[in-house]
Amino acid sequence: MRIILAGTGSAVGKTTIATGIMKALSEEYNVQPFKVGPDYIDPTYHTLATGNTSRNLDSFFMKEGQVRDAFLKAMEKKDIAIIEGVRGLYEGIDSINDIGSTASIAKSLNAPVILIINSRSLVKSAAALVLGFKALDPEINIAGVILNKVKNNAHYLKTKKSIEEITDVEVIGGIIRDDSISIEQRHLGLVPAVERENSLSFIELWSNIIKESIDLDRLVEIAKEAPKLTSPREDIWNKLNKQKVKIGVAYDEVFNFYYKENIESLEANSCKVEYFSPLKDESLPDVDGLYIGGGYPELFSKELSQNTVLLKQIKQFHMENRPIFAECGGLMYLMNSIHEDKQVGVYPYNSILTDKVQALKYTIAEVKKDNIISKKGEKFNGHEFHYSKVLVDNSNIKHDLAFNILRGKGSYNNQDGFMEKNTLASYVHTHVAAMPNFGGNLAISAREVGG
């Protein structure tokens, strides 16, 4: 069983509704959550609601067969997939094709779509929206509608009647407007669930509202109508290494932006993954390589700077030529400082948080130098989203950069991937589907030095 919850646009309530549905259905089913697009934050709510790690599905990173492979791997021993879309149903990397859109995932998985509409001040115009979304692409099965932010029950019933009589699409529920149930936001989007002490109580509240407002039995019936997937699959990672190595992964309230498949690709390449906290731990685990993902080090820079023992150990790990791969927030952590707070100091540059977006885009990178995760001449898709920047220009740049950024911005002069010994740090986030040798290459790099 599978179903996609898509919006007519951003800010229609997809995450609140999807998470509430996931929580409500988890009382009876083993629910596997998914999120369309390059999002680390919404999935934290899905995971908390279901107890199962939410996965990302993205047609910019993944070929069609890889979308199905990632989906089917995650669905083993699960009952139903609830897939939260991104932005509007048809929004992708440009205004014409489907790449990067929720619609592309619906096609790859042959999944029915429930369209979520912000119904504030709409009645018959909501029917026009549904007609337009149906007509734009007949391959998309818009099987139902959820009306969010209706004024009252009378408003809901009028809008439901209009949609069902004009479009022949059923409305399976409506949620009365209540701004108190919205999720707290910050500069990169929602505040991750791992940082909110009251996240679970909010999810319980959303679930109760969903149970009162949406016909969940009908939603499950629609999900059951999805046909069996018979189209071919394509592996999202390659297995290159069989020798056992250990990789330390930074994971806490500061660093938690990881795609689960990236971690699994390490495990598939004989890596034992050991998690550690740069914020709280007093020593590194006994490992052969480090992976430091993104997050919010700019909000914890002072606390990170006070853990001087761990800062020194990571610097020493680097000096011993053992591999370290860092993305975005991890890149900032390896710099000399964040704001004026001292960090690891692998690189002599300073990083700061600005008041405007520095980069928000899907990226295409070409590898120009061999490094611990990729080889010269390869190309890979990724994404970048940050308000921070590294204070580097042609007057102080001292490092080779591994990647030419063909689409996107990068860290410096349309380049990214600071290289120093066996350490690589980049603003570009990678997904193993776009770099199938990621786990194997990092494992081999760790094996050659310390494994």
UniProtKB/Swiss-Prot annotation:
- Pathway stated in the Swiss-Prot or TrEMBL entry: Cofactor biosynthesis; adenosylcobalamin biosynthesis; cob(II)yrinate a,c-diamide from sirohydrochlorin (anaerobic route): step 10/10
Pfam families from the UniProt entry: CbiA, GATase_3
As cofactor, the record names: Mg(2+)
Gene3D superfamilies cross-referenced by the UniProt entry: 3.40.50.880, P-loop containing nucleotide triphosphate hydrolases
Task: Write out the catalysed reaction.
Answer: cob(II)yrinate + 2 L-glutamine + 2 ATP + 2 H2O = cob(II)yrinate a,c diamide + 2 L-glutamate + 2 ADP + 2 phosphate + 2 H(+); Ni-sirohydrochlorin + 2 L-glutamine + 2 ATP + 2 H2O = Ni-sirohydrochlorin a,c-diamide + 2 L-glutamate + 2 ADP + 2 phosphate + 2 H(+)
PROSITE patterns listed in its UniProt record = GATASE_COBBQ
Record CDD domains: CobB_N, GATase1_CobB
Q: Name one GO biological process term.
A: cobalamin biosynthetic process
User: Which InterPro entries does the UniProt record give?
Assistant: CbiA/CobB_synth, Class_I_gatase-like, CobQ/CobB/MinD/ParA_Nub-bd_dom, GATase_3, P-loop_NTPase
A Gene Ontology molecular function term of the record? cobyrinic acid a,c-diamide synthase activity
Q: Where is this site: Increases nucleophilicity of active site Cys?
A: 429
Active-site residues from the entry:
328
Query: What function does this protein fulfil?
Result: Catalyzes the ATP-dependent amidation of the two carboxylate groups at positions a and c of cobyrinate, using either L-glutamine or ammonia as the nitrogen source. Involved in the biosynthesis of the unique nickel-containing tetrapyrrole coenzyme F430, the prosthetic group of methyl-coenzyme M reductase (MCR), which plays a key role in methanogenesis and anaerobic methane oxidation. Catalyzes the ATP-dependent amidation of the two carboxylate groups at positions a and c of Ni-sirohydrochlorin, using L-glutamine or ammonia as the nitrogen source.
Q: Which family does it belong to?
A: Belongs to the CobB/CbiA family.
Other noteworthy facts: The a and c carboxylates of cobyrinate and Ni-sirohydrochlorin are activated for nucleophilic attack via formation of a phosphorylated intermediate by ATP. CbiA catalyzes first the amidation of the c-carboxylate, and then that of the a-carboxylate.
Q: NCBIfam families annotated for this entry?
A: cobB, F430_CfbB, PRK01077.1
UniProt comment concerning the protein's domains: Comprises of two domains. The C-terminal domain contains the binding site for glutamine and catalyzes the hydrolysis of this substrate to glutamate and ammonia. The N-terminal domain is anticipated to bind ATP, and cobyrinate or Ni-sirohydrochlorin, and catalyzes the ultimate synthesis of the diamide product. The ammonia produced via the glutaminase domain is probably translocated to the adjacent domain via a molecular tunnel, where it reacts with an activated intermediate.
Descriptive protein name: Cobyrinate a,c-diamide synthase
User: Upper taxonomic classification of the species?
Assistant: Archaea, Methanobacteriati, Methanobacteriota, Methanomada group, Methanobacteria
